[in-house]
């Protein structure tokens, strides 16, 4: 059995996601606001998936111990650096900004409500993920999506986490927003 994965079996699912009607229904500013108020949660949980990969393949802590494959560590850390501290847009207050914060800035610029996501983040920070997910302000579809993501993370299976990240996010997301 080869270690290579043939992703062609995922093409029908990829086409279904990329062609989802929601992407063709965002035709007005009010619809864009609603979309972003829901989509911001997967933007956040993407970072949790990525940080789980980092903890697995590029663990941090003190004392530091040499472990794992340097090429994989470098690859994961480069993605984390890009996602957590990308070059900010000109004219902003900061020179570097996370993609999540950039998304929230974009939401603010179009008048989308940031209350739900900000309350969610504050609740997760203070009371944990389970309490955050239980908040009634979290859209049900976002809650189900995040639960699915965290089930993968909590499985502790690096190959599942990497597959969710690579095939379920990095490979598919660009096509959704063309």
Residue map of PLM features:
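Alpha-helical bundle segments that constitute or directly flank the non-heme di-iron/ferroxidase center
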Residues: 2-18, 27-65, 78-87, 138-145, ...
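Active-site-proximal alpha-helical scaffolds that flank and shape metal-associated catalytic sites
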Residues: 74, 78-178
């Amino acid at each position: 059995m080869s270690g290579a994965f043939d992703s062609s079996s995922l093409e029908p699912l990829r086409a279904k996601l990329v062609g989802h009607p929601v992407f063709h229904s965002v035709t007005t500013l009010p619809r864009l606001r609603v979309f972003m108020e829901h989509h911001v949660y997967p933007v956040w949980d993407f970072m949790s998936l990525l940080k789980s990969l980092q903890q697995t393949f590029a663990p941090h802590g003190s004392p530091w111990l040499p472990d794992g494959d340097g090429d994989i560590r470098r690859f994961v850390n480069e993605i984390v650096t890009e996602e957590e501290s990308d070059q900010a847009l000109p004219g902003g207050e900061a020179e570097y900004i996370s993609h999540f914060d950039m998304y929230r800035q974009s939401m603010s610029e179009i008048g989308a409500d940031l209350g739900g996501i900000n309350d969610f983040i504050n609740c997760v920070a203070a009371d944990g993920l389970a309490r955050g997910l239980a908040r009634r302000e979290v859209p049900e579809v976002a809650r189900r999506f995040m639960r699915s993501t965290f089930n993968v993370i909590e499985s502790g299976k690096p190959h599942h986490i990497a597959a969710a990240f690579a095939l379920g996010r990095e490979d598919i997301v660009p096509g959704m927003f063309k």
